[in-house]
Amino acid sequence: MIENCNIRGFERQDLARLQEIRAAAYEPVFESFRRIVGEKIAQVALSNSEREQAELLRHICEATSSHDVFVVELGSEIVAFCSVTFDQASKVGEIGLNAVHPDFQGRGIGTGMYEWALDRLRAAGMHVATVGTGGDPSHAPARRAYEKAGFGAAIPSVYLYRSL
């Protein structure tokens, strides 16, 4: 983790900033998806993607959620967030929705955040950690950060679209 970073648990007043980070970090991803599938399909299949992701973040930040959410502060500013889940039966932990604000990417914050998350998973008794990400060019920075944190074995997955 880089100097001056602090990781702490999510607090309710953090949600607006996490939504800002999510929107900024995922903008190129949604743009890439629209380019890949084409405008005709995107208008139907992806029309609610940003709103659905915003709702997902709101949901996983609820006190009743099964997700643990933490934030990364650089100085007094929240610059990243990550969610994790623990499956005690299978001993598999998952890094879920996460993002580093684009203004702070490329500084090792993501890698440090994932290493911290992996330490949490180990401490909770997990034996395996998983994370899902896209295979398109817009996800390349995330893939690199996951690989730096030690992820390697991957099962490829492809979503196919067509107009009807």
Regions found by a protein language model. Give the residues of each.
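Acyl-donor-binding surface of acyltransferase catalytic domains
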Residues: M1-E3, E147, A153-L164
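Acetyl-CoA-dependent GNAT
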Residues: C5, G9-Q13, E20-G96, H101, ...
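Short helix-adjacent coil turns
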Residues: Q13-D14, G108
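Flexible, glycine-rich phosphate/dinucleotide-binding loops
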Residues: A16, K91, P137-S138, L160
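Residue-level signal for alpha-helical context at structural boundaries
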Residues: I36-K40, G132, E147, L164
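Conserved acetyl-CoA-binding loop-helix of GNAT-fold acetyltransferases
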Residues: V100, G106-D119, R144, K148
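Conserved beta-strand-loop-alpha-helix junction that forms the acyl-donor binding cleft
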Residues: Q105, T130-A142, Y161-L164
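Conserved active-site alpha-helix within GNAT-family acetyltransferase domains
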Residues: T111, A123, H127, G135-I155
